[in-house]
Amino acid sequence: MQTSETGSDTGSTVTLQTSVASQAAVPTQVVQQVPVQQQVQQVQTVQQVQHVYPAQVQYVEGSDTVYTNGAIRTTTYPYTETQMYSQNTGGNYFDTQGSSAQVTTVVSSHSMVGTGGIQMGVTGGQLISSSGGTYLIGNSMENSGHSVTHTTRASPATIEMAIETLQKSDGLSTHRSSLLNSHLQWLLDNYETAEGVSLPRSTLYDHYLRHCQEHKLDPVNAASFGKLIRSIFMGLRTRRLGTRGNSKYHYYGIRVKPDSPLNRLQEDMQYMAMRQQPMQQKQRYKPMQKVDGVADGFTGSGQQTGTSVEQTVIAQSQHHQQFLDASRALPEFGEVEISSLPDGTTFEDIKSLQSLYREHCEAILDVVVNLQFSLIEKLWQTFWRYSPSTPTDGTTITESSNLSEIESRLPKAKLITLCKHESILKWMCNCDHGMYQALVEILIPDVLRPIPSALTQAIRNFAKSLEGWLSNAMNNIPQRMIQTKVAAVSAFAQTLRRYTSLNHLAQAARAVLQNTSQINQMLNDLNRVDFANVQEQASWVCQCDDNMVQRLETDFKMTLQQQSTLEQWAAWLDNVMMQALKPYEGRPSFPKAARQFLLKWSFYSSMVIRDLTLRSAASFGSFHLIRLLYDEYMFYLVEHRVAQATGETPIAVMGEFGDLNAVSPGNLDKDEGSEVESEMDEELDDSSEPQAKREKTELSQAFPVGCMQPVLETGVQPSLLNPIHSEHIVTSTQTIRQCSATGNTYTAV
């Protein structure tokens, strides 16, 4: 605002300018003062103006002169640029909250047109321009034809206006008004407006009561809380949603922010409700679409109970689906390459097996998209013609019509015969790898994106049950087929466990990387580390180039100093991996070199952590957390890079040693032509180490980094242990080695 005064009797001229950041073509109004003699009959003594009047608004400036709204003449100076604000014919509105020494310019209602062509209609609103910024304060837009989507935090003026409104309507005291400021900030931090979504009013109030309880604040009543929400989030509408007799009022147009901790609270409450649900009710859920012709057989009576618990689970499932990538589809399955038919089978039987298995995999994908994991066990039992040896209650798993239909297309006897053929085994293994990779990308499309804790726990429970479900469903199938199928599903389960753990670490580390004080402490502690000594000790094992290690150290410190986001760190790790493996691209030794890089990365990072531990670094906990995250994410990157280089899926790469019969010295030497392995073989042959120690070294190279993680979580399962091979029995010692996909186990005899 600029104020110029003259000594004339006609008074001074007050120039009001509305300054809007990055806005063009705003008309400037020059308000001229009218002589005092013309105002005598219009003067009214007003101590304080509390409300906005459309016909009579006064400026009180100083203690002598009073100007009335009706006697002010205005002149508009238009700009030549395109006008972004066009004046309506409505009356002018002025803010009178400021002191006499400060005048705030208020522009009347406008039709705002953004440069992007997005219109925002505001009826009865105000544009307030002050030294703190430009704010839009408007009334409720219940019947407005336009909608305003708030994507940023409301202005301080909006918060003050909301508190003032509650003070007038409810007579709040000054102490209560100060408490409202924290309540309003909590609302703005955890909620946002959005189109097409709604939240129950009771849910919002429950969240508010919990917040007040945790912070020992006095809550307002539900009615005042409703006014508070409407004053902050303008444009909210109220709808009554739900079935007859069980409907509730909802705020339409508001949702919990994706990064709000209320998401985890809400999911945990829904998960507990699901855990308390009776088992017979859980089995009544059926997919949104009839799957593989067996959905009706799993629904019991097929009737909805209408209980609130079921509605909670259904709502939870629908809410979780927004975190999935339902656009994924099954890849095309290749043809069965078979030269000679097994006895008693025809090519029609093979085609029937292909079509049935395709339908079976599509059914699995459908129930996973709908988060009905328990139905997968029934689908497996149906396809493999599960027949329990001792029926418990005389009930059947599926309807006889469904089984008879599948039996008519491919009898079980022929299915068992085909399962013994090597070509069928290989074809079905490839199909499983493609299907499981699609399921992983559906459930966890982005390992760094936050996932609700209830969904994470459901996925981990699902992964824990997979092997048992499949083994039980294939009780009458040839053992070779069972081993092939279990190896693939084990790789799938292990991938789900790893990715959910990686996601959990990512969310924990995200908070650390956003904390400025922790970042500064980490930098100070890292600068005290003697990297020359670390490199000297690690060089004997890693044999890394000194210049490359020094460059990584510099880049790491610079990235940390810039307070990079988690996504920027992920890009940095990907660049490190690409640079390290670039010399091996297009060579047969690439998978082996990738595994060696993982080992070297893990060893070098452990040396840095050791130095921080010995120095009692204050930020040791933060470094330990991000070290775990970076190791896991580097494993994730290498896994996908090897899959890309070999033309396979990451599930197939991880399941390479999942087939336990394949773990033999002959298969471990399949990269015999690679330079890396040849050098290691020569060093082992020339060494004078005992045979048992050399064999231990060879076998340990076959397993990727992190293979012991499932062992730490669930232990080695007996069903995954290899039959004892004679070549693993060392006659000079009393040790028998048993190898599994999850690590090495030694049993003394």
UniProtKB/Swiss-Prot annotation:
GO terms for molecular function: DNA-binding transcription factor activity, RNA polymerase II-specific; RNA polymerase II cis-regulatory region sequence-specific DNA binding; transcription cis-regulatory region binding. It comes from the Eukaryota. GO terms for cellular component: extracellular region; nucleus. Keywords: Developmental protein, Differentiation, DNA-binding, Nucleus, Repressor, Transcription, Transcription regulation. Residues 663-699 are annotated as: Disordered. GO terms for biological process: cell differentiation; cilium-dependent cell motility; DNA-templated transcription; endocrine pancreas development; epithelial cilium movement involved in determination of left/right asymmetry; regulation of DNA-templated transcription; regulation of insulin secretion. InterPro entries: DNA-bd_RFX (IPR003150), RFX-like (IPR039779), RFX1_trans_act (IPR007668), WH-like_DNA-bd_sf (IPR036388), WH_DNA-bd_sf (IPR036390). Residues 674-688 have a biased composition (Acidic residues). Residues 183-258 bind DNA. It is found in: Nucleus. Transmembrane segments: none annotated. Belongs to the RFX family. Heterodimer; heterodimerizes with RFX1 and RFX2, and RFX6. Transcription factor required for ciliogenesis and islet cell differentiation during endocrine pancreas development. Essential for the differentiation of nodal monocilia and left-right asymmetry specification during embryogenesis. Required for the biogenesis of motile cilia by governing growth and beating efficiency of motile cells. Also required for ciliated ependymal cell differentiation. Regulates the expression of genes involved in ciliary assembly (DYNC2LI1, FOXJ1 and BBS4) and genes involved in ciliary motility (DNAH11, DNAH9 and DNAH5). This is Transcription factor RFX3. The lineage of its organism: Eukaryota, Metazoa, Chordata, Craniata, Vertebrata. The gene is RFX3.
